[in-house]
Design a protein with these regions (language model features):
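Nucleic-acid endonuclease domains
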Residues: 1-51, 56-147
Length: 147
């Protein structure tokens, strides 16, 4: 991995919330030639298929070994750096890992593009909103409006 790619990767893992989401949205827009959304309830629009597109991504990090508490909070922060936790795709069967895709409101889009930023590659998946309820790990109980 050259220095520019490593710097980009490290930046992806450092971005938070809206800025992280914007990078993912721009990437999917460019890859699939989607246009801007028609309203604030989905991220992009597929003019060819006439579908509302939702885009959700997460970084993939090795699972934390301990729950944070008063006695280990500082130590846990020191161990939380990218070098210790970023997971390569080739390691996904060797370690438990954390990735979190939230606020999936099935009724507001037709197709979901969701992706995982590993340390060495990006995995992109596609699912129709009608398939989400049967997706392993999906919960519609986290946020109001997810039903």
């Amino acid at each position: 991995m050259n220095d520019e790619i490593k710097e980009f990767r490290d930046g992806i893992f450092a971005l938070r919330t809206r800025r992280f989401g914007t990078v993912a949205e721009l990437m999917i827009e460019a890859l699939y030639s989607f246009t801007k959304s028609h309203n604030q309830f989905h991220d992009r629009y597929d003019e060819v298929g006439h579908q509302r597109i939702e885009i959700k991504f997460s970084t993939v990090m090795k699972a934390n070994e301990a729950v944070i508490n008063r006695s280990n909070a500082i130590d846990q922060c020191k161990k939380a750096n990218l070098g210790n936790r970023a997971l390569n795709s080739t390691e996904m069967y060797e370690y438990d890992f954390d990735c979190n895709i939230q606020q999936v409101k099935r009724l507001e889009f037709d197709v979901l593009y969701y992706g995982l930023f590993f340390a060495d590659r990006i995995a992109i998946f596609k699912m129709h909103s009608s398939e989400i309820l049967s997706c392993f790990g999906y919960s519609d109980k986290q946020h109001k409006g997810n039903e």
